[in-house]
Amino acid sequence: MPAIEVGRICVKVKGREAGSKCVIVDIIDDNFVLVTGPKDISGVKRRRVNILHLEPTDKKIDIQKGASDEEVRKKIEEAGLTDYMKERIKIKIPTL
């Protein structure tokens, strides 16, 4: 099971959207992927993200590479993961 693959649901661990869940829509190169929330579900805008800023979960939806936000939203609703995607995760910042 590859951790970084199209359709994998991840948690953003860095940045202003830290703690929000997103879906990998496309793999750009070895370091970056294209993700979306979609924004109206989890608050994550469609954008390029460094893979070091993502924590993959065990959940995956079946979408095509480059799927639109509407297609992603439809698949999330079909899988019954809408409430799961809306949940925010509390990120623990290590203290020095």
Swiss-Prot record:
Family per record: Belongs to the eukaryotic ribosomal protein eL14 family.
Name of the protein described by the UniProt record: Large ribosomal subunit protein eL14
MF terms (GO), sorted A to Z: RNA binding; structural constituent of ribosome
One BP term from GO: translation
Cellular component GO terms held in the UniProt record: cytosolic large ribosomal subunit
Keywords carried by this UniProt record: Ribonucleoprotein, Ribosomal protein
Matching Gene3D superfamilies: 2.30.30.30
Lineage, uppermost ranks: Archaea, Thermoproteota, Thermoprotei, Sulfolobales, Sulfolobaceae
NCBIfam families reported for this sequence: PRK04333.1
